[in-house]
Amino acid sequence: MKKQWKPVDSRLNELMHEYSVSIEDLVECTGLSKQRINDYVGGFKSNMNIGTAMTFADAIGCSIEELYVWNFKERRQLTK
C-alpha cells in the first residue's frame, strides 16, 4: 500500500497572522481581488486550485505544504 496525501483544510488565515500578511498585502502581491481572497480566508471558498495555492504560498513566504492541513489514506500500489 502507498500513501495518498489529501489536503484537509487550508491554513491560509493562520499563516497570514503568523507571517504578518494582510489581505491588502495579498491583493497587491497576487493580483487577486479582495473579495476572492476574503472568500478563501473566510472559508467560503475551500477548493483552491494548485496555481492559486502556489500564488498564496509565494506571497506569504511559506511552502505549499504549509498552506494546508494534510491527511493521507492508504491506496493500493499498481502492479504490472
From Swiss-Prot:
Keywords: DNA-binding, Transcription, Transcription regulation
Domain called HTH cro/C1-type: residue spans: 12-67
Keyword DNA-binding: yes
Gene3D superfamilies tied to this protein: lambda repressor-like DNA-binding domains
InterPro entries attached to this UniProt entry: Cro/C1-type_HTH, Lambda_DNA-bd_dom_sf
DNA-binding region boundaries: 23-42
Protein name: SPbeta prophage-derived uncharacterized HTH-type transcriptional regulator YotL
Origin species: Bacillus subtilis (strain 168)
